Amino acid sequence: MDTSILAVTTNPKGKNYALAVCWLLGVGCLLAWNSMLTIVDYYAYLFPWYHPSRILTIIYQSFSIGALSVLVHKEARLNTRRRNLFGYSLFSLGSLAVLVLNLATSGRGGIGSFIGVCVISAAFGLADAHVYGGMIGDLSMMTPEFLQSFLAGLAASGALTSGLRLVIKAAFKNSRDGLRKGATLFFAMSASFELVCVLLYAYVFPRIPVVKYYRAKAIIQGSRTVWADLAAGGIQVQPITQDEEALRYDHRLNKGDLMLLYSDLAVTLFLVYLLTFSIFPGFLSEDTGKYSLGDWYALVLIAVFNVSDLVGRYVPMVKKLKMKSRKCLLITSLGRLLLIPAFNITGIYGSQGWMIFLMSVLGLSNGYLTVCVITSAPYDLLAPEQNALGNLLVLYICGGMFAGVACDWLWLVGKDW
């Protein structure tokens, strides 16, 4: 065994530093898309006949699940460093493209502008497939705490964008020019932050001692995905031969084995995101009725969901509050389906207070169950198996999102559209 690997596996320092970087990388994974979702009132103003909240979401999810399916199939041989850097770079370039499009068209609507926004939404979906699966797979080979921090960062991006959107809306007022200025500021900040994430992942994260420690362990256990990241941290590793690879592979669980063993976790995540995305964001933007909050109403509901989602992802940090039974997690995810008639009835007969309450339940349960399921995946697997399982679970999350977005259109049945 390489002596440099032996050295690094005895020096796991910098855990808190790594947790902070994981959180920031989690924010970057969804910041660009959450920025697009959060300014949905601006797109509804520009493109009132195109159902932008629904169209953009289904385009995003279609490209995300399509690309992720290919990446999951090839995950064992992919260069994780190249995969994640490509994703964060595409997020940054996509955010910059929204900014340029907004400035070039001077905030005018029309089919040309809408097609441009749709193309950028597709690019965000492609970037998400690279980063989300890549990061979850990578962190699955480390520790549940890193996963929890990354997942909390995902939710924090939504909470941050929602809070900023409310401030911008109040500052720029509800005029076309004000909405446009707010959108411009949003994506300027998004493009900058995504560039920071590129730098963090490229030059900071691989040099943290505890990260090198876990990646060195992964190499010892036969992982081929982290060589470039370990090299970026200053540890050079000789590639294993094909004969060694075949010998190690014979003793591993393949993707089919993993899915049979952990199908309950995959189904739970699918159901969680099926329910969430059948309501969020399309139903919130178009089908919740009109109340005293006026055009602030959809933004407030989105903010409530995002903040509740963030809180839910920290609840499992209290060990007594973390649900560990896989059967209970599955039953709870099935129970959430009762929220569909609850939202429907409240949208017709209820007050805005009840709608806000239901939205907080939706967000809190979404965040809580996500962290409980992903961090409950076993850590006695070999590193390549953990990476494969992490990617598979993300695929089921994206599958649930896509199915939910498709079901979201059912809210329009019987309406004049």
Swiss-Prot record:
Cysteines paired by S-S bonds: none
One annotated GO molecular function: nucleoside transmembrane transporter activity
Transmembrane regions listed in the UniProt entry: 20-40, 52-72, 85-105, 109-129, 144-164, 185-205, 265-285, 292-312, 328-348, 354-374, 393-413
Matching InterPro entries: Eqnu_transpt (IPR002259), MFS_trans_sf (IPR036259)
A Gene Ontology cellular-component term: plasma membrane
Expression by tissue: Expressed in leaves and flowers.
Keyword Transmembrane: yes
Keywords recorded for this protein, A-Z: Cell membrane, Membrane, Transmembrane, Transmembrane helix, Transport
Function of the protein: May be involved in nucleoside transport.
Protein name per Swiss-Prot or TrEMBL: Equilibrative nucleotide transporter 2
The organism of origin for this protein: Arabidopsis thaliana
Lineage, top ranks: Eukaryota, Viridiplantae, Streptophyta, Embryophyta, Tracheophyta
Gene symbol of the encoding locus: ENT2
